[in-house]
Amino acid sequence: MEFVLESISPTKKKLTISLTPDEVNTALDSVIAQYKKDLSLPGFRKGKVPNSVVFKKFSEEITNKATEETLKIYIKEIFQKEHIKPLCNLLTEDTDFIRNESFSSTLTFEVLPEITFPNYEGLEVHQDVVKVTDEEVAELLKNIQLAMAELVDVKEDRSPQNGDVVDVDYKGFENGSPVTDVSGEHFVLTLGQRQALEDFEQLVKTAKVGEEKVGIVNFPRDYAHKGLAGKSIDFHIKLNSIKTSILPELDADFAKKAGYEDIDKLREAAKVQLEIKKKQNAKSNAMKKLINGLLEQVTFDVPETMLETRIERILGDHNIRSQQTVQVQTGEERSESEEELYNNAKVEALAVLRPQIFLMALAEKEKLVVMEQEVERALYNMAIRARQDYNKFRDAYYRSGLVYELQDHLLAEKAMELIYNKANVVEVEQ
């Protein structure tokens, strides 16, 4: 076996593997032997079927298996010898072995760019001193109250107001004709939370339960739905219900429902929770300063496939949001051309990938590794947060290949932790 390894770019390589006719024949015969071992055919004893008969019967399967298995072995051997770690699936030519003929196959793959690392030890970074105020504790307790609040129907004869949860049917009309897709039944929103256009909320506030109202809703010129941008649409609405939140009292019963002995213990736990979160945020901000400072000192190419995959994912998420059919929602997302969307997605992708690539390359330099149990622990925590069955969640991650992205993420985290631990962290007052 001979091979030629070429660099197409700083992040892309091409590998050409060549085999002699004898090596091809040996590989084919090895697979034929596997097939004939337990094969029984009329006129032949088990395991004694001639090679030519076996190959004739299973030629396609044998050829494919011999080619794939042999290439897999040689590729692994070459990668180990050349210390290569490909980033993504290998793109190989669709060729198979032919008996008594030489064989050549070319594959391309991407690798991390070579980075000349600046000094990353002993860097000084400022980190905010963490303090938790009584006001912040009170705000957290208020949020817990809201989470445990009971929604009840408003009994008095009144129109809805900010803070109320309303259930509305609506239809949009332009010049007396219904506007396509601008309609909905039992649209639920909390007034005053910018969950809908201001004109729509104001129209809802003019109605009482069971009443129908008509009014004009003006859509911003930069509204995400281009067919509605800048238009004034006649809306017919019907208010189905008004609900308001009844907050529980901050007393011993409330504390016990939240899982604590008394209200003082709940306040203490809330303060600890805030301290932990603030410390995590302060550390995260310090880490961002460190990595951004290091990235300013280096230039490197981002692997093309990695970049395009990330851009496609960002654009896909944008399309999902754009296709959600609540046409009365606020028009804060701007209408953008495809080119603008792509360019913005590229900027967003690079902001994520450049730190990740730098840290992955540093992890390789420092010989950092991610253990299997670390991956399993991360998957378990993710499943818990997503409220999904762990085994199903884990299987889905492995089947989709997302587990490899998770491994890269964990490796980058380890490298970032290394930089932070080697840094001179100076705590400063906010």
Swiss-Prot record:
Residues 163-248 form the PPIase FKBP-type domain. It is found in: Cytoplasm. GO terms for biological process: 'de novo' cotranslational protein folding; cell division; chaperone-mediated protein folding; protein transport; protein unfolding. Keywords: Cell cycle, Cell division, Chaperone, Cytoplasm, Isomerase, Rotamase. One of its GO terms (cellular component) is cytoplasm. GO terms for molecular function: peptidyl-prolyl cis-trans isomerase activity; protein folding chaperone; ribosome binding. It holds the Pfam family FKBP_C. It catalyses: [protein]-peptidylproline (omega=180) = [protein]-peptidylproline (omega=0). Its EC number is 5.2.1.8. It comes from the Bacteria. The keyword Hydrolase does not apply. Gene3D superfamilies: 3.10.50.40, Trigger factor ribosome-binding domain, Trigger factor, C-terminal domain. Belongs to the FKBP-type PPIase family. Tig subfamily. Consists of 3 domains; the N-terminus binds the ribosome, the middle domain has PPIase activity, while the C-terminus has intrinsic chaperone activity on its own. Involved in protein export. Acts as a chaperone by maintaining the newly synthesized protein in an open conformation. Functions as a peptidyl-prolyl cis-trans isomerase. This is Trigger factor. It comes from Lawsonia intracellularis (strain PHE/MN1-00). The lineage of its organism: Bacteria, Pseudomonadati, Thermodesulfobacteriota, Desulfovibrionia, Desulfovibrionales. The gene is tig.
